[in-house]
Amino acid sequence: MSYQQRANDSMNSAKQYSSSAGAVHNSDEPFSSSGAPQNRNFDTSYTSEIPSNSSRAANDMGTDIGSGDPYAGMTSDTKKGFNSVESRKKEQSDVRGGDTSYSRRHDDSSYSSNKYSTGGNDSYSSGGRNEDYSTSGGSYTTDPSRTDDTASYGQSQYNQSRKTTQGGDYGEDYSQSYPTDTYGSRQKATPSDTVGGGAYDYSSSGSHTHGGSHGTEHRGGSYGNDNTANKTRGAVSSAGYSGEGYGKGTYATDTTAEANRRAATGTRNARTTAQRNAQLAEDEHVSMGDKMKGNMEKMAGKLTRDPELVQKGEDLKTGHHSERY
């Protein structure tokens, strides 16, 4: 056998071992997308056929496969270019540049740890915009000297200057001008508008008693004498009408009939209390039960020395509800 033929046989043997023999050969299904059965003992993503040591060594030295030592780069035991699992792993690592230097330096250090995790996030959380708007941004809420748009809605205007609470356009001036002066305590304390139904409208001198818009007429105007005599009965008319309300001594009886009777007899305020009560009892037809109840309450008031209870019993007897209640 010639020297050239032996070199070709050695190269073919190395190629056949690298693609088929190995320690374990799985041929039941293809490993790559090309469909060609390949050895699964190592990754073949960078080359479909890994060259032997002899052929690669010959090419690296720039020599022809047929010249020089045909066994250059091969191991001494098999003369096939692979000695063990470690040598196959080294071959794989040398062909594609190495797993460690490629994946860890490229993926972990450059893109994961340094650029996007440590350097990237820190620049946006510690020293970036977040700090400008959170830590240094306290001037938006606590700095009273700020005059921009954010400061006008911040703490200084609403809390320190209190524009809308105590010292501003809608604050203290507003509360004094509208609720306090018009509807509040100043209105009742300073009756500047008494005659027109202002400050004491609903108190003792208001419009419904004898100081407001109906006040003067109430006592001496169109409703004057008739109202005082007929609806509130006599000398305690103002007290009965204003202090007791509308249901106590004011409209308890048929005021129209009483007014007609008094207008016909001409006895307005000229009768005594006994005469008036007797007439009221006659007009209203007090029942026997009310009379008995009035007697009992009157006696109880005398025993307990309670003048109000005595008066209440008298009112029940006569059918008249006193202006005192």
Swiss-Prot record:
Protein name: Uncharacterized protein C23H3.15c
Residue spans of biased composition, Basic and acidic residues class: 86-109, 282-325
UniProt feature, compositional bias: Polar residues: 1-21, 29-57, 114-167, 174-193
Region feature Disordered, mapped onto this chain: 1-325
Compositional bias ranges of the Low complexity kind: 200-210, 252-278
Recorded GO CC terms: cytosol; nucleus
Residues in coiled coil: none
